[in-house]
């Protein structure tokens, strides 16, 4: 017996010296993280409810002064319980109170240089990041990170819901990559991406397990002046690894690597896990591990805006047409109008000043469009060469503040390099000094920015509403996209889809070109299913005239800021239902479908139990009609809070008091 105990002690000692292993659990014990340094290669595994959802996956990075991917040894481990409490106004949940386990590991490489890895483990979320610590003699004081071995290795049967990255300086006016490629649902791990250069965040995975599914969402957060990363192509037995920007982005200018001071941390890589899609839709991990980077004295207002360009295009950016859309905003009680590209030539600064005064007389404020650059791509629309230059940028921001302009939309970034991510931060910081909120388009995914920057509204970072106008193909895809984004793009950040489209045809006259294929209630429901604190309602003057009164009245009070949410039902790219509570306490439930046949859904709505509600729904098409038939009725909800609804193909349902 004594010999056996001695052998076990010796084995334990050997394991500690050559293959240290550390485990940590989520507060509810369902997530189980294990980190090892076996063979000098740090790896982690992740189990959820006893199922290995991420197989052994590599950790580590390579810097100019040291290799932290091999010859590594864990020399110190600390674990503590943490509680994250904060309030926000521009995301899916206004108050967050999150408990988690924090595991901090200190490793050294074969030269004795230190690397810290911090894991944040909540009930359905894991986040981790690296911190390069000072070396013993405090030199070097700065470093370049060339890449990471950080990987995500899934079971072989896993299915994917991802959108590919594309080669740089491609597409219209060499503006790509701009995070505007098509998602492919339920693909196999071994399927190659369309362009062969990996995938942009966020990335959704489904692990089938004896008739049940485990869902995993991978993304990153806390990126400010660091490159935006992505997932590589899949490698059998190894999985996906973190990839840095492509060298050709920004017309080849700037490094694809990360330049940092020491000590310094990378962004957090986030993993959300659940046996249903509820944790995916409701996660707050992008905000839980970041902090505000500056405060503000400005009172930034949420709201709704009208936008002529989405249906009337470039030629509408003139003084008279913009007045018409100001009038629409005023009629509907909306706070803003977006004056889009080419205003510098087609309206002029004096014209903008006159428009600002006219809008002010109607209780409406302007938002102005800007090109982000003049050197990174060939997008011709102006104003150009302003937002990329600090002197010109501040000059225009001071002018806008004087006019009462409340926000800017900055477009055509086309890259993830460190200098581009720094430009986002610089624009936001300067805009805050002049009381301006900011929307970014043609650009990367926001990574925790709603909490980091108090004047940030949203990014596009997906195929958005303009494509519904451009081609009939994308018009037919609209329902698919908008039932997919709640589980992917909008799950990790506010999303400027860019327009609740009420025109029946994608044209100024509302009679020509291809039709809209979704129902009116579907479009209205996207104000609930999509989350963005300043939301576009793409009403045109002629579409407004033809709206039924019940639609018009609902659109007048469409909410944009939320206190809470509850996932109700859905499957990515097929259907989605959610309930959201406004900051004033009023609940709205909405369901949309991309299915080819009507679907029956039983919604659990305890907030409406025993109450009379209004149910807005798209009904079947009438004989000879191209469009679903919208309607509204009052209905009493039973004490059990259950409501059975029929959702038409490309149709929607809304429930509110």
Positions of predicted regions on the chain:
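Carbohydrate-binding surface patches
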Residues: 571-609, 653-654
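Conserved, mostly hydrophobic/aromatic
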Residues: 130, 329, 411, 438, ...
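Bacterial Sec-dependent N-terminal signal peptides
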Residues: 1-21
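C-terminal beta-strand-rich structural cap/linker in extracellular carbohydrate-active enzymes
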Residues: 633-657
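Aromatic- and carboxylate-enriched substrate-binding clefts and catalytic-loop regions
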Residues: 338-519
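An acidic-aromatic substrate-binding cleft motif
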Residues: 257-336
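Glycine-rich, aromatic-lined ligand/substrate-binding cores of catalytic
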Residues: 508-583
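N-terminal accessory beta-strand-rich subdomains and adjacent acidic, glycine-rich linkers
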Residues: 21-282, 631
């Amino acid at each position: 017996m004594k010999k056996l105990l001695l052998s076990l002690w010796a084995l334990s000692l050997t394991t500690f010296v050559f293959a240290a292993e550390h485990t940590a659990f989520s507060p509810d014990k369902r997530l189980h993280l294990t980190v090892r340094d076996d063979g000098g290669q740090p790896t982690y595994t992740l189990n959820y409810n006893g199922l290995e959802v991420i197989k052994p996956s590599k950790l580590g990075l390579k810097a100019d002064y040291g290799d932290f991917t091999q010859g590594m040894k864990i020399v110190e481990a600390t674990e503590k319980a943490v509680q994250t409490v904060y309030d926000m106004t521009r995301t899916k949940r206004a108050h967050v109170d999150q408990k988690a386990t924090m595991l901090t590991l200190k490793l050294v490489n074969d030269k004795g240089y230190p690397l810290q890895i911090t894991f944040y483990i909540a009930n359905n979320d894991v986040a981790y990041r690296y911190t390069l610590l000072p070396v013993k003699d405090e030199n070097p004081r700065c470093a370049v990170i060339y890449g990471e071995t950080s990987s995500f290795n899934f079971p072989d049967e896993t299915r994917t819901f991802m959108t590919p990255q594309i080669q740089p300086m491609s597409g219209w006016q060499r503006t790509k990559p701009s995070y505007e490629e098509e998602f492919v649902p339920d693909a196999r791990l071994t399927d190659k991406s369309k362009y062969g250069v990996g995938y942009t965040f966020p990335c959704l995975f489904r692990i089938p397990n004896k008739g049940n599914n485990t869902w995993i969402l991978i993304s990153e957060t806390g990126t400010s002046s660091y490159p935006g990363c992505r997932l590589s192509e899949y490698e059998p037995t190894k999985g996906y690894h973190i990839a840095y920007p492509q060298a050709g982005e920004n017309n080849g200018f700037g490094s694809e690597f990360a330049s940092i001071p020491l000590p310094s941390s990378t962004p957090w890589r986030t993993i959300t896990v659940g046996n249903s899609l509820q944790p995916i839709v409701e996660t707050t991990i992008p905000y839980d591990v970041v902090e505000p980077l500056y405060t503000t004295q400005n009172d930034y207002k949420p709201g709704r805006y009208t936008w002529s360009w989405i249906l009337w295009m470039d030629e509408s950016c003139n003084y008279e047409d913009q007045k018409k859309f100001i009038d629409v905003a005023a009629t509907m009680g909306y706070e803003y109008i977006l004056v889009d590209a080419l205003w510098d030539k087609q309206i002029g600064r004096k014209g903008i000043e006159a428009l600002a005064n006219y809008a002010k007389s109607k209780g409406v404020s302007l938002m102005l469009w800007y090109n982000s650059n003049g050197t990174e791509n060939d997008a011709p629309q102006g104003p150009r060469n302003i937002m990329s230059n600090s002197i010109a940028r501040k000059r225009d921001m001071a002018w806008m503040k004087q006019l009462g302009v409340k926000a800017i939309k900055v477009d055509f970034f086309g890259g993830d390099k460190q200098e581009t991510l720094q430009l986002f931060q610089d624009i936001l910081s300067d805009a805050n000094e002049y009381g301006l909120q900011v929307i970014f388009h043609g650009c990367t995914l926001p990574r925790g920015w709603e909490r980091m920057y108090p004047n940030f509204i949203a990014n596009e970072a997906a195929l958005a509403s303009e494509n519904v106008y451009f081609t009939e193909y994308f018009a037919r895809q609209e329902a698919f996209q908008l039932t997919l984004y709640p589980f992917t793009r909008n799950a990790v950040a506010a999303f400027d889809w860019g327009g609740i489209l009420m025109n029946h045809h994608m044209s100024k006259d509302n009679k020509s070109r291809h039709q809209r294929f979704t129902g009116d209630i579907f479009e209205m429901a996207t104000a609930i299913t999509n989350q963005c604190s300043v939301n576009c309602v793409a009403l045109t003057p002629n579409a407004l005239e033809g709206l039924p009164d019940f639609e018009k009245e609902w659109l007048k009070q469409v909410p944009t800021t939320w206190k809470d949410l509850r996932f109700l039902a859905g499957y990515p790219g097929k259907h989605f239902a959610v309930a959201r509570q406004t900051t004033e306490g009023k609940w709205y439930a909405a369901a949309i479908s991309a299915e080819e046949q009507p679907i029956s859904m039983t919604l659990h709505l305890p907030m409406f139990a025993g109450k009379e509600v209004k149910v807005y729904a798209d009904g079947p098409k009438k004989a000879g009609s191209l469009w679903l038939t919208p309607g509204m009725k009052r209905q009493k909800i039973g004490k059990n809070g259950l409501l059975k609804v029929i959702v038409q193909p490309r149709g929607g349902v809304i429930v509110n008091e």
